[in-house]
């Protein structure tokens, strides 16, 4: 096969990153790692950045621009040239689920109207709202363009910690005590007694530890609530669960089979440690580390792996998820699910599968194969 024929035989993958989310920079870092591990002999990468204002712009394959440098986090800049993904070859939506190819075209700038790529599959490496919450997935579903990862329902439910716990409870998966607030208010004496101290106050729909506070006394509660509501209009107050934080990856193959990874234990959370990793620890100082596989009894590891798949199925997930638990004296308790887990250099999802012998490149290839199945 000639080099030109090989080029046309490659699968064209549009990698979306950035987005209108507090996790914008994390998405950029994840996308850089994904692009680095897409085999150029097999895939033609079309990077598309989404600015914090929501503009779609030509992205970069220079992944050095998609890395953190201390506190200097990568961002998608608007250079004035905008692009859009159109469908059906004429800018019209295809039938849902048709798996039609999309056209990536310029909509502003000197090449406005020009198609510069035929897209076989979209890899939405988007974290947080307006990307991981079912919004982008809905657009792609309506257009009939294939994409990596979860659909609208699983993405929306997984983004919302409240609905994740509701579905998990219905499926018989252990979860902790929580309280949902839609506006700041004082807790009642009964609520305080039920939750106890400390509590964690979180935006219900967010990630990367943004907007989260640990409250050790009720005098700290008002400030924690204000911070959480500055990031979301729905807040979850969770009781402290004593146990190590353990993460488990789930991967669905092209044939529909579902596997879970060996779990990872976040160091510093074992033996009832009561801290938590904030954004800086995860992405600026890089102080997060983990032991893989988690140093837990074989029976506990087996239970975590099974519960991860049960959670995946309870939410109707497809392709990918990372499921987080607390390993308590009485067994694993669900913390949350990530329907588009991070792919950054410190992210646990690729590391856990690497411990199973699945390389980063094989992992992203498996996810694309599932999307195209």
Curated annotation (Swiss-Prot):
Its EC number is 6.3.2.4. This is D-alanine--D-alanine ligase. It comes from the Bacteria. One of its GO terms (cellular component) is cytosol. It holds the Pfam family Dala_Dala_lig_C. GO terms for molecular function: ATP binding; D-alanine-D-alanine ligase activity; metal ion binding. Binds 2 magnesium or manganese ions per subunit. InterPro entries: ATP-grasp (IPR011761), ATP_grasp_subdomain_1 (IPR013815), D-Ala_lig_Van_CS (IPR000291), D_ala_D_ala (IPR005905), Dala_Dala_lig_C (IPR011095), Dala_Dala_lig_N (IPR011127), PreATP-grasp_dom_sf (IPR016185). Keywords: ATP-binding, Cell shape, Cell wall biogenesis/degradation, Cytoplasm, Ligase, Magnesium, Manganese, Metal-binding, Nucleotide-binding, Peptidoglycan synthesis. Disulfide bonds: none annotated. The keyword Metal-binding applies. It is an enzyme of class 6 (ligase). It catalyses: 2 D-alanine + ATP = D-alanyl-D-alanine + ADP + phosphate + H(+). Mg(2+) 2 binds at residues 336, 338. Belongs to the D-alanine--D-alanine ligase family. Its cofactor is Mg(2+); Mn(2+). It comes from Corynebacterium jeikeium (strain K411). ATP binds at residues 192-247. Cell wall formation. Mg(2+) 1 binds at residues 324, 336. Residues 165-369 form the ATP-grasp domain. Pathway: Cell wall biogenesis; peptidoglycan biosynthesis.
């Amino acid at each position: 096969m000639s080099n030109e024929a090989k080029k046309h035989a490659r699968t064209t993958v549009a990698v979306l990153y950035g987005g209108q989310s507090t996790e914008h920079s994390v998405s950029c870092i994840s996308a850089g790692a994904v692009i680095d591990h897409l085999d150029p002999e097999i895939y033609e990468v079309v990077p598309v950045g989404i600015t914090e204002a929501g503009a779609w712009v030509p992205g970069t394959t220079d992944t050095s621009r998609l890395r953190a440098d201390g506190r200097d986090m990568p961002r998608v800049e608007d250079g004035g040239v905008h692009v859009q993904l159109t469908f059906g070859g004429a800018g019209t939506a295809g039938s849902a689920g048709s798996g039609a190819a999309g056209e990536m075209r310029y909509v502003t700038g000197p090449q406005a109207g020009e198609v510069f790529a035929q897209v076989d599959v979209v890899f939405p490496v988007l974290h947080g709202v307006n990307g991981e919450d079912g919004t982008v997935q809905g657009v792609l579903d309506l257009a009939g363009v294939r994409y990596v990862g979860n659909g609208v329902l699983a993405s929306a439910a997984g983004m919302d910690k409240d609905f994740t716990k509701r579905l998990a409870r219905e499926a018989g998966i252990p979860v902790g005590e929580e309280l949902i607030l839609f506006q700041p208010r004082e807790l009642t004496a009964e609520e305080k007694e039920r939750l106890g101290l400390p509590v964690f106050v979180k935006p219900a729909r967010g990630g990367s530890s943004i907007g989260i506070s640990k409250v050790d006394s009720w005098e700290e509660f008002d400030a924690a609530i204000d911070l959480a509501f500055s990031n979301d209009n729905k807040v979850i107050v969770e009781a402290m669960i004593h146990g190590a934080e353990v993460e488990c990856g789930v991967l669905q193959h092209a044939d529909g089979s579902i596997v879970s990874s060996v779990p990872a234990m976040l160091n510093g959370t074992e033996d009832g440690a009561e801290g938590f990793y904030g954004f800086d620890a995860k992405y600026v100082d890089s102080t997060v580390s983990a032991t893989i596989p988690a140093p837990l009894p074989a029976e506990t590891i087996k239970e975590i792996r099974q519960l991860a798949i049960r959670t995946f199925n309870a939410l109707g997930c497809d392709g990918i998820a990372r499921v987080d638990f607390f390993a308590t004296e009485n067994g694993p308790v669900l913390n949350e699910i990530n329907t588009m887990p991070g792919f950054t250099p410190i992210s646990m999802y690729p590391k856990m599968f690497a411990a199973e012998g699945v390389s980063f490149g094989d992992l992203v290839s498996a996810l694309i194969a599932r999307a195209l199945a």
